Regions:
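N-terminal domain-onset segments
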Residues: 1-81, 91-96, 108, 208-210, ...
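Interaction-surface and assembly-scaffold signal
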Residues: 9, 113-232
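Aromatic- and glycine-enriched beta-alpha-beta binding-site module
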Residues: 67-144
Length: 232
């Protein structure tokens, strides 16, 4: 597959070049969903949610997604990523806020922050595996953040799935709502996570996933539409 054409632009005060939106990315993801008591969510979650929005809770708990993504050649950028996301409600609408995210690409970091107010930080991410077995880990400043071991199982019917997603973010005096879409082949997965208890994802340490999936042959178009406003 040939790489998608790039439209580089300067992003942010660092002047790091990144593709203009929308970003077309291809690769695979391993994602798990955790039930977390609303009172156990760290302050960083609230700091990234725009005023007027709030996390979605059911029976006092919020569903937190944790994912490792591997974006491969064929998209506008190639990099690895660790993130968490929480569903939020604003008015009668639903969206997702990403409070924690790490990448190993300066271009991805710059673009995520400048274009969509996604608080990407740089980290060392490792990924290995053979066949259905996948291992991944993330480190920041030499300290572990999280790691996983996954066994990818059978493909789920009916084949290729599609999904639309809205992100709602607050960062650096900006609130940004962005729309994206994705297509992928979902697989069952057995995933074991390890989160550093004293790290930024310590609120997930010791918790078992409620559901885990492997998303193979994924195609993501991020930032198909965006609205932005300045906030105090």
């Amino acid at each position: 597959m040939s790489a998608a054409p790039r439209d580089d632009r300067a992003a942010g005060p660092s002047g790091v070049l990144c593709p203009a939106e929308p970003w077309r990315l291809v690769g695979s993801l391993v994602v798990s969903f955790f039930r977390v008591p609303a009172g156990a969510l760290p302050d960083a979650v609230g700091a990234r949610i725009p005023a007027g929005a709030r996390p979605v809770t059911v029976a006092g708990s919020t569903l937190v997604a944790a994912a490792f993504a591997h974006y491969a050649p064929g998209g506008v950028l190639q990099y690895d990523e660790l993130l968490t996301a929480v569903p939020v409600r604003y008015g009668r609408r639903l969206a997702v806020t990403v409070p924690h995210i790490w990448v190993d690409s300066p271009q991805s970091r710059a673009g995520g922050r400048e274009l969509w107010a996604i608080p990407k930080d740089l980290a060392v991410l490792t990924r290995s595996g053979r066949g259905a077995a996948v291992r991944a880990a993330a480190y920041a400043d030499g300290a572990p953040i999280a790691s996983l071991r996954a066994e990818v199982g059978a493909r789920l019917p009916p084949g290729r799935w599609g999904a639309a997603l809205t992100t709602l973010q607050r960062l650096g005096g900006q609130e940004v709502r962005a729309r994206s879409r994705a297509a992928f082949r979902p697989h069952a997965a057995r995933v074991s996570w390890s989160f550093a208890p004293s790290g930024p994802l310590g609120h997930l340490a010791g918790r078992r996933p409620w559901l885990s999936l492997a998303l193979e042959d994924a195609s993501v178009v991020f930032g198909t539409e965006r609205t932005r406003r300045a906030v105090p």
